[in-house]
Swiss-Prot record:
Residues 115-134 have a biased composition (Basic residues). One of its GO terms (molecular function) is structural constituent of ribosome. This is Small ribosomal subunit protein uS9. It comes from Methanopyrus kandleri (strain AV19 / DSM 6324 / JCM 9639 / NBRC 100938). One of its GO terms (cellular component) is cytosolic small ribosomal subunit. The keyword Ribonucleoprotein applies. GO terms for biological process: maturation of SSU-rRNA from tricistronic rRNA transcript (SSU-rRNA, 5.8S rRNA, LSU-rRNA); translation. Belongs to the universal ribosomal protein uS9 family. InterPro entries: Ribosomal_Su5_D2-typ_SF, Ribosomal_uS9, Ribosomal_uS9_archaeal, Ribosomal_uS9_CS, Ribsml_uS5_D2-typ_fold_subgr. Keywords: Ribonucleoprotein, Ribosomal protein. Residues 109-134 are annotated as: Disordered.
Length: 134
């Protein structure tokens, strides 16, 4: 059995778990090949760390990502974080880490923004009911 690296990525309420093992470059998200994922915007987000890493690194590994929770874009960004962290851990290459950080810091560090809780007296976190009209 070869080497296996497990990493996680979170975005809003979406959680992704990536398993990276020796292989021939297969990338699957929820058991579906990455090149058939729709919408295209989500597919491009997931492909970003693979493109930056380069074909020579990606062709040596198989990546399986399981994502749950959140919306389709949050799931794509969570998968992207998990893949990027996994490839950095797999290669142990500080240059790859620097390339990810230069492209987008949130690819490795995550994005701390969360939904603000709703308060009483209005429809949302900040919106209030109208006091009077005329």
């Amino acid at each position: 059995m070869g080497r296996v690296v497990q990493t996680t990525g979170k975005r809003k309420t979406a959680i992704a778990r990536a398993v990276i093992r020796e292989g021939e470059g297969r990338v699957r998200v929820n058991k579906r090949p990455v090149n058939i994922i729709e919408p295209e915007m989500a597919r491009m987000k997931i492909m970003e760390p693979l493109i930056i890493a380069g074909e020579d690194i990606v062709s040596q590994v198989d990546i399986d990502v399981k994502v749950q929770g959140g919306g389709w874009m949050s799931q794509a960004e969570a998968a992207r974080i998990a893949i990027a962290r996994g490839l950095v851990e797999w290669t142990g290459d500080p240059d790859l880490r620097d390339a990810y950080m230069a492209y987008d810091r949130h690819m490795l560090k995550g994005d701390p923004r969360r939904k603000e809780p709703k308060k009483f007296g209005g429809r949302g976190a900040r919106a209030r009911r109208q006091k009077s009209y005329r």
